[in-house]
C-alpha cells in the first residue's frame, strides 16, 4: 500500500530522473 504522495513522487522521477 503506497501513500497518496507516492504517485506524485513517481511523476517527479519521470520528469527529473531521480530525487
Swiss-Prot record:
Comment on bound cofactor: Adopts alpha-helical conformations in the presence of divalent cations and is unstructured in the absence of divalent cations.
UniProt keywords, alphabetically: Calcium, Gamma-carboxyglutamic acid, Hydroxylation, Ion channel impairing toxin, Ionotropic glutamate receptor inhibitor, Magnesium, Metal-binding, Neurotoxin, Postsynaptic neurotoxin, Secreted, Toxin
Domain of life: Eukaryota
The keyword Cell membrane appears for this protein: no
Residues recorded with modification 4-hydroxyproline: 3
GO cellular component, one term: extracellular region
Record PTM 4-carboxyglutamate, positions in chain: 4, 7, 11
Binding site for a divalent metal cation: 7, 11
Reported function: Conantokins inhibit N-methyl-D-aspartate (NMDA) receptors. This toxin has the highest potency for the NR2B/GRIN2B subunit and a smaller potency for the NR2D/GRIN2D subunits. It induces sleep in 10-day-old mice when injected intracranially, and hyperactivity in 24-day-old mice.
Protein family (similarity comment): Belongs to the conotoxin B superfamily.
Comment field (misc): The mature peptide does not contain cysteine residue.
Protein name as annotated: Conantokin-Pr2
Amino acid at each position: 500500500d503506497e501513500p497518496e504522495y507516492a504517485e506524485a513522487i513517481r511523476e517527479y522521477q519521470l520528469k527529473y530522473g531521480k530525487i
